[in-house]
Structure formats: C-alpha cells, structure tokens
C-alpha cells in the first residue's frame, strides 16, 4: 500500500484537538482545524462591528485555539512558526474542504451521539480512501461507525493520543470489524515512523488499555489509602520514582490530569462493568465532595495538594482539610531505597511486613491480577499491555515486567495463601515450569503467549544498546564512556558517566574512538540511551581542582577538551552527534563540531555555562559564532547573536528551535521518534561516507575585534545599569565578549581557530578562580539550580 498523508483535518479545537493539530504541524503536515460556529457575539466582536456572518466570528473557536497554542505550557509547538501549517475554520463553512484531507481526526466532546453526527458530516464530504479516526478516550469505536458507508468503515479506526500529544509517547490504535487490515498496518507504521509514537493495537473496550489499567490502579490506591488510614503524602512516597513511576506519583498525577477528567474516564468503565470491577470504578464519596467543591487539581489551584506562597499543603481525605505534607516513615522503605535499580527496590519493599510494604503489596497485587484477567479482552498479548502502560503513564516497568521483578512464583504463592483467585492461564504457565513472563536469549527478548514464548517484534529502527553490547561486545571502555560496534561499519561512542557529564575519561575515549574509526569504520556516532544526552562538563571535578588551586590540571583538561572537539571537526571519517533531552554546556559543545547533528525532536540544547559562573570552554563560543557567519550574518551581527545566546544561557525548547538559534545547521537532521535516533544517526554517518565525505578545510575566522567588543560591552553595561544583571554577571559578560569578538584586534581581522581557543581557555581559567563563580558551581551541584550572585 502506497498511501501518503499530505494533509490532515482535525475536528474539534479544544486542548486535545489543537494539541494534535500542533503535533501534525510540528512534523510539517498542513492541517485544517475546524470547530462549531458560535451562537453569540462576544463584546469585543460587537465593538469591532462584526456580525454572526463574519468569518472571524464563525471560525472564532479554532482561531482562539491557535492563539492559545502560542501561550500554553508545556508548549505544544516545537516552534511558533509552525502555526503557518494550521488553517482555522468551522464545520459549516469549511466542510467541503474535508475532501482535501488524507486523514480526518475527530476530537469533539465525549458523547456518542455528537460524534455520530460529526461522522455523518464527514462521510458526506470526505474523499474515497481518506482515513477517518476518533480520538475518543473510551467510547466504543464500533458504535461510532454505525450507519456509515462501507468505504468509511474500511478506513475508520480509533487513534487515541495521550495529552499532551507532543510529549506523551503512546498512541492506541483501535480497529473496528470492518477496518481494512492494510489501513491498520499503514497507520501503525505512520504512527511510529512519522508521528514518532509508541503504537499499540487495542481492543474496542471501555478506556482501551492504558486508561483501563491506569484508572483501576489509581482507584485501588485510593481505596487502600482509605482502608489503611494512610495520608496522601505517605502514598506518594512509595508510588513514585521508588517503583519506577513519575515523580507525580499518585495524587500529584490526579491533580495534573484533573479530578473531573479522571472521574469521567472512571465512569466509562463503571457504566459498563458489573460485580467487583464496577465497585472498584465507583468514585469514592470524598472525591465526589472534592468535585462539588471544585477542588479538581492544578487548573483550579487546589486538589489533593494546595500551594500557598512557597508552602505546599496536602489534603486529609477524611476531614477534607489541608495540612502539612507527610512522608512515609518505614525502616523497610529506607532499606529499599538503598537497593540498586527499580526492580531490586520493589522486591525489597513489597514483601516486607510493615505499613509501607503492606500498602505496596495491596496496590500492586490487585493491579497485576487485574492486568492478567484483562488479557485477551483489552489486548492480544502481555507485551502490548506493558508498552501501553510505559508509554502512556510513564511507568518504567509494565505490569508483567513488574511481576517478573517481584518474582511471579513467590507472589503467586503469597496470593494463593491470601485466598486470591489466580487467572487460569497463569496457573497453567507455572504448572509448565515457566516462572517469568519475559526471557532473553542472544539479545532477543521473548514474551509468554498462549503456552509458548514469542519474540518481541521490533522495528529495525529501534537499536537497544544493552542488547547490542551483550551480543557484539564492547570495543573499548573506561569509567565514562564505551566504544561499541553499531553495525553496518559504524562505531558508537556512548557516554555513561553520572548524568553523562564530560570529564577526562570521556575525552580520552573520544580520542580512542576517532582513532579506531579512522582505521576500521565508515563513521562514528556520538550518542547514548541515558535519561539525557549530556548535562555538561564534570563540574564537581572542576570545582575541586580550582578550590585546591590546581589550575594546571584544569588547564590540561580544558586544553584536551578543545583539542578533542577540533579532532571531531577535522576527522577523516564523518562524526554524527545524536543529542536528545538535556544537551547542555559541554554536551552542546560535543555536538557543534560534528560533521552532522542528528537530533531528537525533543533535544534541549544550549551553552549555559554563565549560570555556573563560567563561559563555554570546549570551543562552543567559536563554533556557534561560525554557525552564525555561515547563515550570512556579518561579524558584528554574528557576534551579537552568539553573545546574547550564551550570556543569557538560552536553551532551545526543541531541536527545531535549536536550528532557529543556529545551534543546528541547515544540513543537520531531526528524528521525531527518539527510539529511532541512533539508527537514523548511523544511517547518516554511513551515507556521508558512501557519498564521498571529506573533512572541512581549515579556514581563518573573520572577527569584529575591538569594535565588536565595545558594542557587546555597551549592551551588557545597559543591562547592569537597568538591574537585569549583577556585577558578577557583568564580569562574566566582559570575558565572554572578549572571546566572541576575537580579542583586541581591528574589525574584520581574520584569525585562526587555535587563537580563539587560546583566549577562550584563558577566560575560562580566569573565571574559574573567582570566588563568586565557585559559589555558583557549588550551588548548582548542591541545589541543582543556578545562583544569581
């Protein structure tokens, strides 16, 4: 099937609809955003002399939604410029335009009859073969298609995005009986490769997979809290990062989602369930009281938590009053925290017989049993359920992975002792001697499915570094980095220091990696699969050395860092950097000299050293300045833009924004699906080699010199006089201005790169000896945020 989605239409411009439209715009798909025609004029429209027939009025809702996209946090758009891909309109005047769309997505109110009316309109105006989908979070997709044409049904399915659409990975696809299998296959591939999502196929049941299990787990947690007399803060102490869940844990998650939204999702199942399941999905009375009071969470200013000034209070579910935050106090909990890794932490706590252990057991065991009971009803296999929970709710471990972590056999024995009913398929599994849901052989992961283990089907674009290292081994390794054979004659330099911070160990491994690549490989990728690409240089090491007055050691490290970055730039084989997540300071400097950057769409890049009292010390000043020159800026303008970006420690909110900041060059590329990042980078490195890559020829750099230095200082002085920056900020700015301007040389002087690196290194060393800079470094290491002194 050679289908293409060149244009889309989103019907419904609320938070979810506009968010989906924004995500499509982010990847360059033109989208028509339609909503209903308002009944009345606003006062502002009346003042303008508009009438109900004015197009501005008739398309008001979608126009307003577009304006809100520019103000929302977190930002739905990867760049404000992407609004140019969105065309606002309304469902009456612009219905004819639906025939232009290859994909039409309904995102209106969760009401079956309203949705059916919308789809009748769509069926009338769509072109034959266009894909139509609903973003419903739990209404029957099959029922929505009743009465529609055969071609409509063949091209219809559910596409449930999680909010916010840009950031949350999960896309549940729900086919109906009549959905063409080729359409399901196409949308699955499109969802992963183009939209960048983690796609699972779900059954057409209430709340599908993630919301069904997630809502159950949250309600079970609330019920166990009430039964055991626990406090909100105590519960959140153990249901967050300790067990591989987001920091928001249980009740902060409910505040963010909104209790009103959560209650609606719970009622989807409650209305269709019976027996014990129905009772679990009944909203507890105290939560109904909260709904009546409007205490629905963050958007109302209070929910399970309330912030007054800088103090956060938590709700007592019994008295409905707010008090000081609580934390679980438990010897078993403290012992579990010392265990290494989420799996070990869970196992250490869940079998302990104290308040923390009992709570975790009661919550987890019920959720695991429920997940097992739903197999076949909500999804065909355990892997789909696990992936849905990880991608949709941010769990580190899916239910069946969690079960493996705590020990299936041990937990089953305890459940039987407590009189719980084990699902028949699990009893059968254990009787056959199979004690884990997942096994790994020769780097391939298998999952248990109907009496046998089946290999997890992987997109070839997903590279799992751990599995790769287990099968291919490691070429070289030290404490900070490893050199790995990535396949297809491309090597990978992986950072694995704490926070992937760059120290001498990583610098040495980059040297070794470049030498090995020049001998035996087509190219080198610099990348990893940590939480973030790199948060910067090893600040603790720098601070320790300067506090010991060991400036020679710091000079040596910075010199080696600069030399290594130059070696990357002029490598005989192409080097591709693959940044993602936080890519700050030295992390950005490690990318700038690469032949190409293959960035994840969610790459947050910037030279932020001023926040710790320093300036970039690995050639970042020079490379960013050169990038501006290459975009056609004259030396003065290029210096101004470089200075502003570094002095203000600007960080891009996306890879697209990094390109607009000239951190990425026009030739650099972006991967929407971060799971494909290393594959894309590998392909790019091999392609550069195969098409005759040659390293750049060294050229001199034209600088603005003394004239530029004076202009940069003038701006900094004005900021100081206006109270925007401190005296120490100004001192940093002076050093930075000197480096970017190229020192005290005439305007337009052409200097070599080594000279610029020398004055950069001198400025870095000078600032590192300043007491206030050291205070900033110390503050960042201890508090994790910048000190303005």
UniProtKB/Swiss-Prot annotation:
Protein name as catalogued: Probable 3-hydroxyacyl-CoA dehydrogenase
Reaction it catalyzes: a (3S)-3-hydroxyacyl-CoA + NAD(+) = a 3-oxoacyl-CoA + NADH + H(+)
Its biological purpose: Involved in the degradation of long-chain fatty acids.
EC number(s) stated in the UniProt entry for this protein: 1.1.1.35
Induction: Repressed by FadR in the absence of LCFAs (fatty acids of 14-20 carbon atoms). When LCFAs are present in the medium, they are converted to long-chain acyl-CoAs, which antagonize FadR as to its binding to fadR boxes on target DNA and thus derepress transcription.
GO BP of this protein: fatty acid beta-oxidation
Gene3D superfamilies: 1.10.1040.50, 2-enoyl-CoA Hydratase, Chain A, domain 1 (3.90.226.10), NAD(P)-binding Rossmann-like Domain (3.40.50.720)
Family: Belongs to the 3-hydroxyacyl-CoA dehydrogenase family.
GO molecular function, one term: 3-hydroxyacyl-CoA dehydrogenase activity
UniProt entry keywords in alphabetical sequence: Fatty acid metabolism, Lipid degradation, Lipid metabolism, NAD, Oxidoreductase
InterPro entries linked to this entry: 3-OHacyl-CoA_DH_NAD-bd, 3HC_DH_C, 6-PGluconate_DH-like_C_sf, ClpP/crotonase-like_dom_sf, Enoyl-CoA_hydra/iso, NAD(P)-bd_dom_sf
Pathway: Lipid metabolism; fatty acid beta-oxidation
Organism ancestry: Bacteria, Bacillati, Bacillota, Bacilli, Bacillales
Membrane-crossing residue ranges in chain numbering: none
């Amino acid at each position: 099937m050679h289908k293409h989605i060149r244009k889309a239409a989103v019907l419904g411009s609320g938070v979810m609809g506009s968010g989906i439209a924004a995500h499509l715009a982010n990847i360059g798909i033109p989208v028509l955003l339609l909503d209903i025609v308002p009944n009345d004029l606003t006062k502002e429209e009346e003042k303008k002399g508009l009438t109900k027939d004015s197009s501005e009025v008739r398309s008001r809702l979608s126009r307003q939604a577009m304006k809100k996209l520019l103000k929302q946090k977190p930002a739905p758009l990867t760049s404000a410029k992407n609004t140019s891909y969105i065309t606002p309109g309304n469902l009456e005047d612009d219905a004819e335009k639906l025939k232009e769309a290859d994909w039409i997505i309904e995102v209106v109110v969760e009401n079956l009859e309203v949705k059916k009316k919308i789809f009748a309109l769509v069926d009338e105006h769509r072109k034959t073969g266009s894909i139509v989908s609903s973003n419903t979070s739990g209404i029957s997709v099959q029922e929505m298609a009743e009465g529609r044409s055969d071609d409509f049904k063949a091209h219809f399915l559910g596409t449930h995005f999680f909010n916010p659409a840009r950031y949350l990975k999960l896309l549940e696809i729900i086919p109906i009986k009549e959905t063409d299998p080729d359409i399901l296959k196409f949308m699955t591939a499109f969802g992963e490769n183009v939209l960048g999502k983690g796609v699972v196929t779900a059954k057409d049941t209430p709340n599908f997979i993630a919301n069904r299990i997630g809502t159950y787990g949250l309600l079970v947690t609330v019920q166990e809290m009430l039964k055991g007399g626990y406090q909100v803060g105590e519960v959140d102490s153990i249901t967050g990062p300790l067990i591989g869940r987001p920091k928001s844990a249980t009740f902060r998650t409910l505040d963010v989602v909104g209790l009103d939204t959560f209650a609606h999702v719970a009622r989807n199942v409650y209305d269709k369930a019976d027996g014990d399941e129905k009772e679990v999905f009944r909203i507890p009375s105290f939560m109904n009281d909260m709904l009546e009071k409007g205490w629905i969470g963050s958007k109302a200013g209070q929910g399970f938590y309330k912030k007054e000034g800088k103090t956060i209070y938590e709700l007592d579910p019994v008295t409905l009053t707010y008090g000081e935050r609580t934390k679980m106090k438990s010897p078993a909990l403290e012992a579990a925290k010392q265990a290494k890794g989420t799996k070990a932490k869970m196992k250490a706590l869940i079998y302990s017989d104290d308040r923390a252990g009992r709570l975790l057991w009661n919550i987890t065991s019920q959720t695991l049993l429920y997940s097992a009971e739903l197999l076949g009803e909500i999804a065909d296999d355990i892997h789909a359920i696990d992936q849905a929970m990880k991608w949709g709710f941010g769990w580190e471990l899916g239910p069946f992975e969690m079960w493996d972590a705590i020990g299936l056999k041990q937990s089953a024995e305890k459940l039987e002792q407590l009189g719980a009913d084990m699902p028949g398929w699990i009893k059968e599994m254990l009787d056959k001697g199979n004690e884990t849901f997942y096994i790994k052989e020769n780097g391939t992961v298998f999952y248990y499915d109907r009496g046998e283990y089946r290999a997890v089907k992987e997109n070839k674009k997903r590279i799992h570094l751990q599995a790769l290292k287990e099968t291919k081994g490691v070429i070289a390794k030290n404490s900070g980095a490893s050199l790995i054979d990535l396949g297809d004659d491309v090597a990978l330099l992986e950072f694995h220091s704490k926070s992937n911070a760059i120290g001498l160990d990583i610098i040495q491994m980059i040297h070794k990696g470049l030498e090995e690549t020049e001998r035996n490989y087509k190219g080198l990728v610099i990348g990893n699969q940590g939480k973030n690409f790199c948060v910067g240089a090893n600040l603790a090491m720098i601070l320790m050395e300067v506090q010991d007055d060991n400036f020679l050691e710091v000079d040596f490290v910075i010199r080696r860092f600069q030399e290594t970055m130059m070696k990357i730039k002029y490598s005989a084989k192409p080097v591709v950097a693959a940044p993602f997540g936080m890519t700050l300071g030295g992390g950005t400097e490690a990318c700038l000299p690469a032949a190409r950057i293959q960035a994840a769409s969610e790459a947050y890049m910037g030279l932020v050293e001023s926040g710790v009292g320093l300036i970039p010390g690995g050639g970042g000043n020079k490379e960013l300045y050169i990038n501006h020159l290459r975009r056609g800026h004259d030396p003065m303008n290029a210096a101004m833009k470089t200075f502003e970006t570094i002095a203000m420690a600007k960080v891009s909110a996306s890879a697209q924004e990094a390109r607009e900041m000239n951190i990425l060059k026009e030739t650099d590329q972006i991967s929407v699906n971060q799971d494909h990042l290393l594959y894309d980078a590998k392909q790019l490195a091999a392609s550069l080699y195969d098409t005759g890559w040659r390293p750049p020829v060294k050229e001199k750099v034209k600088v603005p010199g003394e004239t530029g230095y004076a202009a940069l200082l003038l701006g900094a002085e004005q900021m100081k006089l206006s109270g925007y920056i401190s005296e120490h900020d100004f001192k940093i700015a002076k050093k930075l201005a000197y480096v970017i301007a190229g020192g005290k040389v005439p305007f337009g002087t052409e200097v070599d790169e080594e000279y610029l690196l020398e004055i950069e290194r001198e400025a870095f060393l000078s600032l590192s000896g300043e007491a206030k800079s050291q205070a900033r470094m110390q503050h960042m290491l201890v508090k994790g945020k910048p000190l303005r002194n």
